[in-house]
UniProtKB/Swiss-Prot annotation:
Family note: Belongs to the ATPase gamma chain family.
Span of the signal peptide: none
Function comment: Produces ATP from ADP in the presence of a proton gradient across the membrane. The gamma chain is believed to be important in regulating ATPase activity and the flow of protons through the CF(0) complex.
Protein name in UniProt: ATP synthase gamma chain
InterPro entries assigned: ATP_synth_F1_ATPase_gsu, ATP_synth_F1_gsu
Organism listed in the record: Akkermansia muciniphila (strain ATCC BAA-835 / DSM 22959 / JCM 33894 / BCRC 81048 / CCUG 64013 / CIP 107961 / Muc)
Chain's gene name: atpG
Length: 290
């Protein structure tokens, strides 16, 4: 009976766990759909800004623009991770990529606190960290933007990189490491072309009427591009997080069902053995009484 009680206790425990993972799966699924929709809808906007900036480079000299200027200073890495776990290998893959690609002796700032302990173990210098609400409020990113831009303009940092989990689809999230500042021509071109826009040919520039002037537009659009680039990065990371969590919780729920099935089979076998032994005892006792 002790063995049967243990099996029943384990079945009950796994059922309780499966109810929790199932509830978390449903919550993550709802958040995932919203986050994926926001990430996908934000891509055309940032690509359009990249295309305008790319064309502006041919109209004026951008080398003196503060956000496109190359200068000395330390390297800064913005690490966009999660505040909570239970999202599969998302954060593990991200920190692995950072260890492989980040410059040596870089300084770090983070959005999300889950990987702060990992950075501490690696003896990395953490300058600041932020936690953002879900769904995202654009105003929450203003302090991050101000920190990066002010430090870069003051030449405390010569390069700013960003590491995040790029959203591909529900099953696939790809770690991404790229330069945020200074803004360079080739990444601008690649970003614009990602939207299916043609940047080649004599007619390419005829798509744009630049008012009031290319210089005024550049001063306005460059900060917009950096800020909304940050917004898009966070949206991509959120879509990746909720997708990974939904998949992880779905897998945990399915594993729980398999475990319950195996334990139920073990319980039935143990019960059958117990009944058989009891029948044998009764039969033996009856024969002894004859």
């Amino acid at each position: 009976m002790g063995n049967l009680r243990d099996i029943r206790r384990r079945i009950k425990s796994v059922k309780n766990t499966s109810q929790i993972t199932r509830a978390m799966q449903m919550v993550a699924s709802a958040k995932m759909r919203r986050a994926q929709d926001q990430a996908v809808k934000g891509r055309p906007y940032i690509r359009a800004l990249a295309e305008v900036l790319y064309h502006l480079q041919d109209e004026i000299d951008t080398s003196n623009s503060p956000l496109m200027q190359t200068h000395g200073g330390a390297d800064l890495v913005l690490l966009v991770n999660t505040d909570r776990g239970l999202c599969g290998g998302l954060n593990a893959n991200l920190i692995k990529m950072v260890r492989e690609q980040a410059p040596e002796n870089a300084h770090y700032i983070t959005i999300g606190r889950k990987l702060n302990a990992a950075l501490a173990k690696l003896n990395e210098r953490l300058e600041a960290t932020w936690s953002l609400t879900d769904p995202l409020s654009l105003l929450e990113l203003k302090p991050v933007f101000d920190f990066i831009v002010q430090k870069f303009k003051a030449e405390e940092y010569g390069r700013v990189f960003v590491a995040f989990s790029g959203f591909v689809n529900t099953m696939v999230q790809k770690p991404v490491f790229r330069q945020l500042l200074p803004i360079e021509p080739e990444p601008l071109m690649n970003m614009a072309k990602a939207g299916g826009s043609s940047l080649d040919g004599a007619d390419a520039h005829k798509q744009f009427l630049l008012e009031p002037s290319p210089a005024a537009l550049l001063d306005t659009i460059l900060p917009l591009y950096v800020f909304h680039g940050l917004v898009q990065i966070v949206l991509e990371a959120r879509a990746s997080e909720h997708s990974a969590r939904m998949v992880a919780m779905k897998g945990a729920t399915e594993n729980a069902k398999n475990i319950i099935g195996g334990l139920t089979l073990d319980y039935n076998k143990a019960r059958q053995t117990q009944i058989t032994n009891e029948l044998l005892e009764i039969t033996t006792a009856m024969r002894a009484m004859e």
